[in-house]
Amino acid sequence: MERTFAMIKPDGVRRGLTPEILARIQKKGYRVVGLKQMLISRELAERHYAEHRERPFFGELVDFITSGPVVAIALEGENAIAGWRAMMGATNPANAAPGTIRADFATTTGENVTHGSDSPESAARELSLFFREDELLK
């Protein structure tokens, strides 16, 4: 079974989308093995988005992700990384397929409701940033 890191970003939490997104995850058959609502510190945000540090939008990205609570989720299931990314849809909601989370709920590329790891390496790194091993179900 593959594990991945998923996040409901501040815009999704603020708009009350957490129950709907969790329902979609469970309906798809993924197992939630870790879940916490939290505020992300600037330090954690900068570590999480380290690959974007040199990009012009880095500061705005860190400001946004620290602007309110997020829901950090550890998912487990067959092809969880690709499956969760397919459920989210394209980063730009205008390009997201109908029925995806971003097509249904995102307003802009910057405030696009969800995050998901893009590779096994990213999933392992991001899960370790947001969860201790003893916080995850076996």
From Swiss-Prot:
<feature type="binding site">
    <location>
        <position position="9"/>
    </location>
    <ligand>
        <name>ATP</name>
    </ligand>
</feature>
<dbReference type="InterPro" id="IPR034907">
    <property type="entry name" value="NDK-like_dom"/>
</dbReference>
<dbReference type="GO" id="GO:0005737">
    <property type="term" value="C:cytoplasm"/>
</dbReference>
<comment type="similarity">
    <text>Belongs to the NDK family.</text>
</comment>
<keyword id="KW-0460">Magnesium</keyword>
<feature type="binding site">
    <location>
        <position position="57"/>
    </location>
    <ligand>
        <name>ATP</name>
    </ligand>
</feature>
<dbReference type="Pfam" id="PF00334">
    <property type="entry name" value="NDK"/>
</dbReference>
<keyword id="KW-0597">Phosphoprotein</keyword>
<keyword id="KW-0067">ATP-binding</keyword>
<keyword id="KW-0418">Kinase</keyword>
<dbReference type="GO" id="GO:0006241">
    <property type="term" value="P:CTP biosynthetic process"/>
</dbReference>
<feature type="binding site">
    <location>
        <position position="102"/>
    </location>
    <ligand>
        <name>ATP</name>
    </ligand>
</feature>
<keyword id="KW-0963">Cytoplasm</keyword>
<dbReference type="GO" id="GO:0004550">
    <property type="term" value="F:nucleoside diphosphate kinase activity"/>
</dbReference>
<protein>
    <recommendedName>
        <fullName>Nucleoside diphosphate kinase</fullName>
        <ecNumber>2.7.4.6</ecNumber>
    </recommendedName>
</protein>
<dbReference type="InterPro" id="IPR001564">
    <property type="entry name" value="Nucleoside_diP_kinase"/>
</dbReference>
<dbReference type="GO" id="GO:0006183">
    <property type="term" value="P:GTP biosynthetic process"/>
</dbReference>
<dbReference type="InterPro" id="IPR023005">
    <property type="entry name" value="Nucleoside_diP_kinase_AS"/>
</dbReference>
<keyword id="KW-0808">Transferase</keyword>
<feature type="binding site">
    <location>
        <position position="112"/>
    </location>
    <ligand>
        <name>ATP</name>
    </ligand>
</feature>
<dbReference type="GO" id="GO:0046872">
    <property type="term" value="F:metal ion binding"/>
</dbReference>
<comment type="function">
    <text>Major role in the synthesis of nucleoside triphosphates other than ATP. The ATP gamma phosphate is transferred to the NDP beta phosphate via a ping-pong mechanism, using a phosphorylated active-site intermediate.</text>
</comment>
<keyword id="KW-0547">Nucleotide-binding</keyword>
<keyword id="KW-0546">Nucleotide metabolism</keyword>
<feature type="binding site">
    <location>
        <position position="85"/>
    </location>
    <ligand>
        <name>ATP</name>
    </ligand>
</feature>
<dbReference type="GO" id="GO:0006228">
    <property type="term" value="P:UTP biosynthetic process"/>
</dbReference>
<dbReference type="InterPro" id="IPR036850">
    <property type="entry name" value="NDK-like_dom_sf"/>
</dbReference>
<comment type="subunit">
    <text>Homotetramer.</text>
</comment>
<dbReference type="GO" id="GO:0005524">
    <property type="term" value="F:ATP binding"/>
</dbReference>
<feature type="active site" description="Pros-phosphohistidine intermediate">
    <location>
        <position position="115"/>
    </location>
</feature>
<feature type="binding site">
    <location>
        <position position="91"/>
    </location>
    <ligand>
        <name>ATP</name>
    </ligand>
</feature>
<keyword id="KW-0479">Metal-binding</keyword>
